[in-house]
Design a protein with these regions (language model features):
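Short, flexible turn/loop "capping" segments at secondary-structure junctions
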Residues: 29-30, 228-230
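C-terminal "lid/loop" region of Rossmann-like NAD(P)-dependent oxidoreductases
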Residues: 232-235, 245
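Residue-level recognition of strand-loop junctions within catalytic nucleotide-signaling folds
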Residues: 19, 238-240
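Short secondary-structure junction motifs
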Residues: 99, 229-232
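NAD(P)-dependent short-chain dehydrogenase/reductase
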Residues: 113-118, 122, 130, 139-228, ...
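N-terminal Rossmann-like NAD(P)+-binding domain of SDR-like oxidoreductases, especially those catalyzing
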Residues: 1-168, 215
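PAPS/PAP-binding and catalytic site of the sulfotransferase fold
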Residues: 5, 245-246
């Protein structure tokens, strides 16, 4: 959806990711007018090669191992991808003088207090399961780079990069056929004439359509490219309280 939106606005889009993990997938259906490169974010040499060739002005970093249950089954890959992969994306940005980085993590990066209030951007990072913990680590990594290498007080003096982190959660929308997604599991079960299996029927979580947080990511990206240093920090993106809980 982000690639589609950017290309519709006339941006030259270079995508870097693994092969589409699900079938069907909207990447093939949309026939996007983008440059698509198959690669792993843990491969720093290839990242540097791609960045050097295409010289991006802005990087939206969304690549991740995004599944909680899979993180229990394969914690090493989860941490390698979500933490070390993020580190290598930042290093490629640093080596190639990228102007703006929009780093996408998750609302699961926060330490879960089990309280009724929403989380604020300055609440502590945490993470009970390997996935959530890896996202908290990635967020701390972004904070470190923002302080160490992309410090706004040194902007235009020792570096030319602004880094913002965006946190959203429970994003739904067309094209998401990944495992362990509630809406996806319901659609698959109904289409196959099977009973719907609900893992945590008492759980309540806020939902938002994919275009909602994406509009926020694009807004932050625009502000960074406009050299608005006050936007180089962490941002939450979530739905309103009314009508957003299931």
């Amino acid at each position: 959806w982000l690639c589609f939106w950017l290309s519709q606005m006339g941006a030259k889009v270079v995508g870097y990711s693994l092969e589409a993990p699900t079938n069907p997938n909207h990447i093939e259906l949309l026939k996007l007018d983008i440059i698509s490169i198959i690669g792993d974010i843990r491969d720093l040499d290839k990242l540097n090669q791609v960045f050097s060739e295409y010289k991006p002005d802005i990087v939206f970093h969304l690549a991740a191992q995004p599944l909680v249950r899979l993180s229990y089954e394969n914690p090493i890959e989860t941490y390698e991808t979500n933490v070390m992969g993020t580190l290598k994306v930042f290093e490629a940005c640093r080596a190639n003088n990228v102007k703006a980085i929009v780093n996408i993590t998750s609302d699961k990066a926060y330490e879960n207090k089990e309280w009724i209030w929403g989380y604020r951007e300055n609440d502590p990072m945490g993470g009970y399961d390997p996935y959530s913990s890896s996202k908290g680590c990635a967020d701390l990594l972004a904070t470190s780079y923002r302080n160490s290498y992309f410090n706004i007080n040194e902007y235009k003096k020792t570096h030319n990069t602004l880094l913002a982190t965006c946190r959203a959660g429970n994003v739904i929308g067309g094209g998401d056929w990944a495992k362990d997604r509630l809406i996806t599991d319901i659609m698959i079960s109904v289409s196959q004439g099977k009973k719907v299996s609900i893992r945590n029927p008492k759980a309540t979580r806020p939902w938002e359509h994919v275009l909602e947080p994406l509009s926020g990511y694009l807004h932050i990206g625009q502000k960074l490219l406009e050299e608005k240093v006050e936007f180089a920090e962490a941002w939450n993106f979530g739905p309103s309280d009314e009508g957003s809980i299931t």
